[in-house]
Swiss-Prot record:
Residues 207-221 have a biased composition (Basic and acidic residues). It is found in: Nucleus. The gene is Zhx1. Induction: Not induced by gonadotropins. Residues 272-432 are annotated as: Required for dimerization. This is Zinc fingers and homeoboxes protein 1. There is a cross-link at residues 159, 441, 485, 629 (Glycyl lysine isopeptide (Lys-Gly) (interchain with G-Cter in SUMO2)). Acts as a transcriptional repressor. Increases DNMT3B-mediated repressive transcriptional activity when DNMT3B is tethered to DNA. May link molecule between DNMT3B and other co-repressor proteins. GO terms for biological process: negative regulation of DNA-templated transcription; negative regulation of transcription by RNA polymerase II; regulation of DNA-templated transcription; regulation of transcription by RNA polymerase II. Residues 1-63, 198-247, 430-455, 540-568, 627-664, 731-767, 829-873 are annotated as: Disordered.
Amino acid sequence: MASRRKSTTPCMVLASEQDPDLELISDLEEGPPVLTPVENARAESVSSDEEVHESVDSDNQQNKKVEGGYECKYCTFQTPDLNMFTFHVDSEHPNVVLNSSYVCVECNFLTKRYDALSEHNLKYHPGEENFKLTMVKRNNQTIFEQTINDLTFDGSFVKEENTEQGESIDVSSSGISISKTPIMKMMKNKVENKRITVHHNSAEGTSEEKENGVKASREENAENTSSSASESNTSTSTVNQVHPSPAGTVVTPTAVLPGLAQVITAVSAQQNSNLVPKVLIPVNSIPTYNAALDNNPLLLNTYNKFPYPTMSEITVLSAQAKYTEEQIKIWFSAQRLKHGVSWTPEEVEEARRKQFNGTVHTVPQTITVIPTHISTGSNGLPSILQTCQIVGQPGLVLTQVAGANTLPVTAPIALTVAGVPNQTNVQKSQVPAAQPAAETKPATAAVPSSPSVRPEAALVNPDSFGIRAKKTKEQLAELKVSYLKNQFPHDSEIIRLMKITGLTKGEIKKWFSDTRYNQRNSKSNQCLHLNNDSSATIIIDSSDETPEPPAAAASQPKQSWNPFPDFAPQKFKEKTAEQLRVLQASFLNSSVLTDEELNRLRAQTKLTRREIDAWFTEKNKTKALKDEKVEVDESNVGSSKEEPGENSPGDEAVAPKSAGTGKICKKTPEQLHMLKSAFVRTQWPSPEEYDKLAEESGLARTDIVSWFGDTRYAWKNGNLKWYYYYQSSNSSSLNGLSSLRKRGRGRPKGRGRGRPRGRPRGGKRMNTWDRVPSLIKFKTGTAILKDYYLKHKFLNEQDLDELVNRSHMGYEQVREWFAERQRRSELGIELFEENEEEDEVIDDQEEDEEETDDSDTWEPPRHVKRKLSKSDD
């Protein structure tokens, strides 16, 4: 026993040497060496670690028991410690491999290299991946026999036993593993078999090696060779546990690359279920099963929609797919067995009812959870992952892929799936430390009803369903701040908002567009400057704002009266006297509606948010109109001291007086002149133009923005009388005519115009800047119509729109005016009233008049002469 046999045939050779006479001999009768069970070994190279185990277990010539220790074949290293010997072989002889041969039974192909076998499979068995390798010993040489296996319903392969003349090794007791440096590992069976993965990837010529820790018993157990049921931490991949089955070893179809863990979908089962053997039925045992149906897209699509078709659906499928109903029924049954779908009749009816009443909308979800550190690797990853497919169920149960040095069986992860989301964040549970195999529970996939569902585990993008998602308060706050800065954001601002809010570019642009539209079309578009509080709320859609309880609102006392209501004013139900009293009291207290006050009014009056907001909007509008009327009256009384051009509706709408808003400064004539001139140039200034106006006029930028908004609104409603005057003066200055002196109508060329009476001679001319507002006289609407009538003598319908815009009169008013002229013409009476003609002459005179100091003569204007002549008569 202790003597060392001399052998001329080495058991281990370098990878560069390929000697066909090399052989691997297993002498079980000598008894294995005394080994210390390896637990918590280091997680090093799989190939290197397995080489040592192979060399120790399977070949006594390589490592003989030398005084209770181990001796290296290629150097003088000796040690009694297996771990030390393992480390030595890994570090000093990394290229040591075992001698083996490979035989393809189907083609009778023999080779010494695994790469050659892979090339053979790629050439003669293209697309075939269901290979089975059986290890036998023949003539003191280890041989791998490759056959093509049959697929069972659960996706596993049945591996037959091949024995050779009593020298072969029982396959059920052997764990077969292959890597790029092929190494055989012979293990003994103790209590239960291991479910091991062998997978050939023909493109890469690789397969994965499943390694189990080896324990050797003492001499009294030499007769009954065994393998420990517990796995050591040297395992870099995970194995599904199956229970004792004397029929043979079950090999799963899924294999993974080095360092890659197998995807396992698992839920806890009964602990005593490990006593029940798992029965695997080969597909070819069903005589009517037709494998051609597996690639039929119609059947696959139907199965994905619902795994239990009705008889009528089977009949339709039979007619469309050109297969018999019996074949289709068998195919659906096989698919359900294959994917582990087993529902009770009640569950089938419930799932069907949910599907047809709109609860279940989607095709089954296929979800694979892969750690980020291995999900980026290529290495044929998509083709070797076995995913878990859950059919017709709203709850999904899955576990994450186990990493290195871990076991895969964990508590299930439940999540809710609705539709096919673009973004799904799956919360992964932590994988616990390695547990003994005896405590591992078997895994089952596709549970019909999952009791534990965590909605927060899946974040679904609602855009994929066409549902408009509510914006959060943080998103709305960012959008409102940006809107107050610029109503037309640049691309850089949109990109910044996309990063901050997480919204899409289309959503952001639509929000800005809706806000501008609602602000422009709102009848309550009056800018209240609440002490320059830029935090005023802009409500675009009531669905974007979640009502808060009064207690929460009390801690945020910001002003939120909505100057831009989200919809046009609506007709609400009549309010009771008590409701009106409460609303009136609140309005008298403060015309600005805060969140706190709004919540209090909602609770007290039982009115909706929109009703209260609309009521306050209308009250503010009415109050602003009253204040404007009073101010106009005051300005008319003191017109000798004030400029009449300051009371245009577009200007008064800028700063309506309301209780609690503070003192709002009026704009000076110079400031108004600058704003009006800029408005004539463009109604939508750019941000740079706004800044320039603010710098030149001394007004706040928000005031200028508000003035332009209100003026645009007044212009749209035809309330801007000064617009055409500024437009004509702008066009004249652009054409270079502003410096030319105008002459009065009908005045002889040789006559000049004298200076007005009461003005000192030789005085300095008034500056045009100061003079323009006081000298502006506007033609009335009838004067414009009169000019048109004198020119054309009738109303041309093509010019109606232009006349309406210029005269600021309605369509019916213009038509009635021309009808009156026609009636007067037919009756032979005077076409125009005297005061109307006089006003028009005054307007023309004042419009054309320009003061000069170069005339020594003065004569009264024509309208004064006319009055004097009338008085003389």
